Amino acid sequence: MLLIPAIDLKDGQCVRLKQGDMDQATIFSEDPAAMARKWVDLGARRLHLVDLNGAFAGKPKNLEAIEAILEEVGDEIPVQLGGGIRSLETIEKYLDAGLSYVIIGTAAVKNPGFLQDACTAFSGSIIVGLDAKDGKVATDGWSKLTGHEVIDLARKFEDYGVESIVYTDIGRDGMLQGINIDATVKLAQAVGIPVIASGGLSNLTDIENLCEVEEHGVEGVICGRAIYSGDLDFAAAQKRADELNGELDDA
């Protein structure tokens, strides 16, 4: 089970939002690269970056911070990024800069042809981000709820060749209410590609519950507010996940 720390970028700083509201941002660090180093030193095997300004603007807005993070840890672990990715040129620029994966969200839902082109051009590097509330997909920084069923879209995108799916239950994100395990498993069982859970992770119990369903295709979990607020000790949680998955050697 991959525990993936999230570094949400707003105006070059590492912040957390409450339910996607840009006006409800808590600044956790003015040095995102130092934050990235901290999580890697604590045992992170992948990082999840979000360009919040980019998500709302529809184009990259935190390039300097992203490049600083990649310079700091990009040679050590894979780094994925979402937010504002609306063109093949942007994807190419990010992958050339050292990102391992880019996450396409709103653009995938609104313009499936773009996602298809991206999967063809950058095979193995495209993750799709599906944000849903009550099984229905939301777009545009969660401001618009669509009529699309999340499972239908996930299956379609799997056919296009996406690497994996980051699934966010937007009713719970940033609220520390616990991961929506049932909805995550339901999605993972419906597709043959890995699903990464997101939204609402609150404590070690969530991690233990996710490890129990890993066999259904739940590959990892995005760790957001809980590891910043202290509700979850990241290093201890990754260690516990490894124990549960029998990945610890007898050493």
Curated annotation (Swiss-Prot):
InterPro entries: Aldolase_TIM, His_biosynth, HisA_bact_arch, Isoase_HisA-like, Isoase_HisA-like_bact, RibuloseP-bd_barrel. SUPFAM superfamilies: Ribulose-phoshate binding barrel. Transmembrane segments: none annotated. Its EC number is 5.3.1.16. GO terms for cellular component: cytoplasm. The keyword Transmembrane helix does not apply. One of its GO terms (molecular function) is 1-(5-phosphoribosyl)-5-[(5-phosphoribosylamino)methylideneamino]imidazole-4-carboxamide isomerase activity. The active site is at 8 (proton acceptor), 131 (proton donor). Belongs to the HisA/HisF family. This is 1-(5-phosphoribosyl)-5-[(5-phosphoribosylamino)methylideneamino] imidazole-4-carboxamide isomerase.
